[in-house]
Amino acid sequence: MIWHVQNENFILDSTRIFMKAFHLLLFDGSFIFPECILIFGLILLLMIDSTSDQKDIPWLYFISSTSLVMSITALLFRWREEPMISFSGNFQTNNFNEIFQFLILLCSTLCIPLSVEYIECTEMAITEFLLFVLTATLGGMFLCGANDLITIFVAPECFSLCSYLLSGYTKKDVRSNEATTKYLLMGGASSSILVHAFSWLYGSSGGEIELQEIVNGLINTQMYNSPGISIALIFITVGIGFKLSLAPSHQWTPDVYEGSPTPVVAFLSVTSKVAASASATRIFDIPFYFSSNEWHLLLEILAILSMIVGNLIAITQTSMKRMLAYSSIGQIGYVIIGIIVGDSNGGYASMITYMLFYISMNLGTFACIVLFGLRTGTDNIRDYAGLYTKDPFLALSLALCLLSLGGLPPLAGFFGKLHLFWCGWQAGLYFLVLIGLLTSVVSIYYYLKIIKLLMTGRNQEITPHVRNYRRSPLRSNNSIELSMIVCVIASTIPGISMNPIVEIAQDTLF
């Protein structure tokens, strides 16, 4: 009899939960329509993988790319709509969140064609790779729109778990296993630190989890200047510093970049930074509204450390992927300037604009590295010597992307940095901007060193890798080359295109 009553209660509780979930999906599902498209694409991939004995590779890539493009289209149709909070306050849709979601989708759309030939040549499992990429993209999109502490914790964990699996995708490679282990341990530690910080926010605000309600709770409890908030701020800064690869939480980055498959590195190098930047902006700007001076100071210190450490250590690297790892640490230091400047002086618009250019510059560089690695099997910088004599198109593409990363005019990277530094200067961040300018000059040095090697390698310096290099025809259906061409063109956009991009970015402000 007791078991029968308990069973009935369980059925009733399950029915209530199901009906509540159905009600939320029915009335709030339109707010996550782009995410639902990706979920539908994931289900299709799983169905095809489980029902078909022979994998139709082009069809799998078509489904993945189509779901990403359709999700981008859904975002564009929703542009300029009124901000809305859905799912009982867990998720918020506004222009600011949506443009970061657009950037994440753009990264994934460019990374999938960049990975096609690499996966086929290395004979890795294709369906699982696409599932992990789409799931990580989904986690990043939910993180951009997260409006409460639980979603802010769960969404990056969804992204991180897929990132761990992708970084160790080449299971027989010892370096890949080492990279995955370090990434997993450091990621778990940073997540624990974030949860500890959230517990301080939760307790200090009187049990609130929504971002805006936390602010109201801190006002009601008079705890907005308490030591607990300072502790939460420090722990959140450390946790987000890991996600963004900010010094001194950057130690995992070079090892993961070097050990992971190159297309995976290309994907992680941009999507993780875009998603974490969106989340950091909202967390610092809303719950820590009353501690703006404190978190400004903390981020300034981390930005300076990242710009100096990243660019100085990059000079000494012999591996192309490790060099780009340290370069990305310096690059995120520039992005932090936009977060510190904030809404008042166009900081968010400059940050978004620079991130758009950074995506094209970084993915273009990695596309060149993937092509060179597939044709030579090496990642050493010295092995690029004299590449121009064998493949001028690839050498010029790599040179343009590197020059744009360094910020030389008239390439896109120059105008992106110029606008970012100008906004920082107007906001009074003189020392931070000066450090940014000096470290940009340092970065130009090691980029030019590689370009000199590409163009002027003497015969005695050319390694067997380049001597035996097989150049592909100029017109090719190679998906990596197509992705590379798109990124190179976007990296060389002249400054005349800056104004419309900045104006669009201005519409994303709170």
Curated annotation (Swiss-Prot):
Q: Which InterPro entries match?
A: NADH-Q_OxRdtase_suN/2, ND/Mrp_TM, Ndh2_N
According to Swiss-Prot or TrEMBL, what is its membrane topology?
Answer: Multi-pass membrane protein
Q: Which GO terms describe its biological process?
A: ATP synthesis coupled electron transport; photosynthesis, light reaction
Query: Its Enzyme Commission number?
Result: 7.1.1.-
Which cellular compartments is it found in?
Answer: Plastid, Chloroplast thylakoid membrane
A Pfam entry, by short name? Proton_antipo_M
Output the Gene Ontology terms for molecular function. NADH dehydrogenase (ubiquinone) activity; quinone binding
Signal peptide stretch: none
Catalytic function, reaction form = a plastoquinone + NADH + (n+1) H(+)(in) = a plastoquinol + NAD(+) + n H(+)(out); a plastoquinone + NADPH + (n+1) H(+)(in) = a plastoquinol + NADP(+) + n H(+)(out)
Q: What is its main location?
A: plastid
Q: Which residues cross the membrane?
A: 24-44, 57-77, 99-119, 124-144, 149-169, 183-203, 227-247, 295-315, 323-343, 354-374, 395-415, 418-438, 482-502
* UniProt function note: NDH shuttles electrons from NAD(P)H:plastoquinone, via FMN and iron-sulfur (Fe-S) centers, to quinones in the photosynthetic chain and possibly in a chloroplast respiratory chain. The immediate electron acceptor for the enzyme in this species is believed to be plastoquinone. Couples the redox reaction to proton translocation, and thus conserves the redox energy in a proton gradient.
Family assignment from sequence similarity = Belongs to the complex I subunit 2 family.
- Quaternary structure note: NDH is composed of at least 16 different subunits, 5 of which are encoded in the nucleus.
Name of the protein described by the UniProt record: NAD(P)H-quinone oxidoreductase subunit 2 A, chloroplastic
Q: What organism is listed for this UniProt entry?
A: Manihot esculenta
State the organism's lineage: Eukaryota, Viridiplantae, Streptophyta, Embryophyta, Tracheophyta
Q: Which gene encodes it?
A: ndhB1
